[in-house]
Design a protein with these regions (language model features):
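N-terminus-centered regions that define maturation/targeting leaders and the start
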Residues: 2-7, 18, 31-261
Length: 261
């Protein structure tokens, strides 16, 4: 892997150039070689005026069996961490960011993208959730809202919208539904709520003693803690997750009617 870098001799600091243009991509005997040409901005502007011994040059680095996909995944993971921490999913819901991002797609065409804003109308129907699952393992899936009734006053934290256990090999449809899916129903004038999807890998098939909750009532949904649930069943930390935000729209009164509110 040949990468051209800008290296600035400033108290052992290294500045990577802002732009890289892919020029060549060849693969020979499992050795991937790429060549990049840097688009340079005068580097001296980044140094303090007190720096007198300024020196800049380019250097090349060759790395065999370099995984570009892993590099991209690390960069994406950093963005994911930033989103979950920026929006306080950590620590309001979980104590650490899951390593994997779950893919969540709604029948409306909406997708969940690490804190993007969707509408209750877009998320009213049960989504498809996928992750890198072991075919021989069982999983638990949860969707929960830590902002009930609002982020400012979350006295009902958490209000869980969906809970499925004993999911075989990532096939949610074959899992044991503990709480049927209910879409987002943030009250008016309460701002954006966070809706967090989390997947836990079970040690094996479990016996859950939770009351089964239908989707035509909001009873027993509030005051839930996914962290406490995970501790109760020794689920450990979530292996995958994602979240979106939503606020009140015209669908919410329809949902409330469905719930008998």
């Amino acid at each position: 892997m040949f990468i051209s870098r800008l290296i600035i001799n400033r108290k052992k600091c290294i500045f990577l150039t802002a732009y890289l243009q892919l020029l060549i991509h060849q693969q020979k005997k499992n050795v991937i070689r790429r060549s990049f040409l840097t688009s340079l901005v005068p580097a001296k502007q980044h140094c303090a005026p007190s720096v007198k011994n300024f020196r800049a040059y380019t250097a090349s680095l060759e790395i065999e069996n370099f995984s570009f996909d892993k590099y991209i995944n690390r960069k994406y993971s950093s963005a994911k961490n930033s989103a979950m921490e920026q929006h306080c999913v950590v620590p309001d819901v979980i104590s650490c960011v899951p390593e994997e991002t779950a893919t969540v797609c709604y029948p409306s065409g909406a997708t969940v993208e690490q804190g993007n804003v969707l509408t209750p109308t877009q998320v009213k129907d049960q989504p498809t959730v996928t992750w890198k699952a072991d075919a021989n393992a069982f999983y638990t899936l949860c969707m929960t809202d830590p902002d009930a009734p609002s982020r400012v006053d979350p006295k009902f934290r958490e209000w869980h919208h969906w809970l499925v256990g004993n999911i075989p090999g990532g096939d949610v449809a074959k899992g044991e539904v503990l709480s049927a899916y209910i879409g987002s129903g943030p009250p008016p004038d309460t701002g954006l709520h966070r809706y967090v999807f989390l997947i836990f890998k079970q040690s094996g098939k479990l016996t859950f003693d939770e009351k089964r909750l239908p989707n035509n009532s909001g009873d027993d949904r509030g005051g839930f803690k996914i962290a406490a649930f995970a501790k109760k069943y020794n689920l450990g930390d979530p292996i995958a997750g994602n979240f979106y935000q939503a606020e009140f729209d015209d669908y919410v009164p329809i949902l409330y009617k469905q719930l008998g509110a």
